[in-house]
Structure formats: C-alpha cells, structure tokens
C-alpha cells in the first residue's frame, strides 16, 4: 500500500481531532486510513465539506459530511470523558480507541458515494458494500487494531446483530443522535 503524501496532508487538514489520539501509532494508522480512502475516492476534501452527510434525509439537508462527522467525534469524546469521570472503575472508556473509532466510523463512505450531476449518490460499489464493510477493509490495510475496526463495523445498523464494546456504543449513539432527528423528529 503506497499512500501519496498529499493525501496524508489532506487527512490531517480535514481532521484536526486526530491530535486528540495520544498513541502516536494509532494516530498514524487513523490518518493513513483516511488518506487511503481519499486516494481511492472520487470525492475530494472540498466535496466532503459541501455534500450532505447522509443520503437518507432528502435533498434539502444542509449539514455537510464533515460537519456531521466532526460533531460525532466531539460528542463521543465529551461522552467518553464524562463516563470516565463518573464510571471509571466500573465502565472505563479507552479514549484513544473511542476517538479513532469515531473518526473512522464513516471513512468507508468515501468509497460508497459518487457525485452525479453535482449531487452525492450511492455508487455501484456502495450498492454491494456499505461503508461499515469498506471502512473496516481500509482500516485493516493501514494496521488499525481490531478494537477500533469493531467500532467501524458496529456503528451503524449492522452492529445491532452483535455485542458492542463500550466505545462502540458511544460512537453508535453519538452518530444516531445526530442523524435520526434530521430524519424522524416530530416537526411542530
């Protein structure tokens, strides 16, 4: 696997939150996973800061892909810190695993989505492999450990069929609490 330096730089620019990962090796693996996805994707960093974060909420959604992804990471981090404050002995949260998993949860969407007629759509690849699967594949190519790949694999509906780690529960709920209200909230 040969990742071009410009994609590593782009990943770092998209994700200042990478600096929250204290383990240098995990930070590098997480950065490289995003860089590999950018290198293989038809989407550019500009696209990620422009396109809606989901295809499931209609054409008028204004929250961007990166806006949502970064919000999920911030919410997950805040939640993990509070859980460690109140439950450290009974339910400890590994903050590096949590943050890396939150950053990588939707990395597979870079392979799932395409741009057609100026709009993001699910591409042919995405019809066969949803982003939890392609995200794990990208992460494993970059040496991301199993406990982080578990978060990628289980953050979406596919994870409802298995037991989740504490960190995976946090990322799952951070993601869905900032998605479902856009799709399903009571509108008054």
Regions found by a protein language model. Give the residues of each.
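Acidic/His-rich, divalent-metal-binding segments that scaffold phosphate/diphosphate chemistry
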Residues: 1-120
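Histidine-centered active-site/metal-ligand motif
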Residues: 68, 105, 131, 155-156
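Histidine/acidic-rich helix-loop-helix segments that form or flank divalent-metal centers
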Residues: 87-89, 93, 98-99, 136-140, ...
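Divalent-cation-assisted or electrostatically stabilized phosphate/pyrophosphate-binding catalytic cores
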Residues: 119-141, 169
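Short alpha-helical interface elements
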Residues: 59-62, 123, 128, 132, ...
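Hydrophobic side chains within alpha-helical segments
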Residues: 71, 109, 134-135, 178
């Amino acid at each position: 696997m040969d990742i071009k330096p410009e994609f590593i730089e782009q990943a770092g620019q998209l994700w200042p939150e990478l600096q929250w990962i204290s383990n240098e090796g995990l930070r590098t693996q997480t950065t490289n996973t995003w860089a590999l996805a950018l290198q293989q994707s038809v989407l550019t960093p500009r696209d990620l800061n422009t396109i809606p974060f989901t295809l499931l909420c209609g054409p008028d959604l204004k929250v961007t892909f990166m806006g949502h992804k970064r919000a999920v990471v911030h919410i997950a981090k805040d939640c993990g810190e509070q859980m460690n404050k109140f439950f450290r002995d009974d339910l400890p949260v590994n903050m590096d695993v949590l943050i890396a998993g939150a950053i990588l949860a939707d990395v597979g969407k870079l392979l799932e989505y395409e741009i057609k007629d100026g709009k993001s759509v699910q591409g042919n690849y995405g019809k066969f492999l949803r982003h939890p699967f392609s995200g794990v594949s990208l992460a494993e190519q970059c040496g991301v450990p199993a406990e982080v790949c578990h978060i990628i694999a289980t953050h979406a509906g596919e994870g409802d069929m298995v037991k989740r780690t504490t960190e995976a529960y946090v990322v799952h709920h951070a993601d869905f609490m900032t998605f479902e209200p856009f799709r399903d909230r009571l509108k008054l």
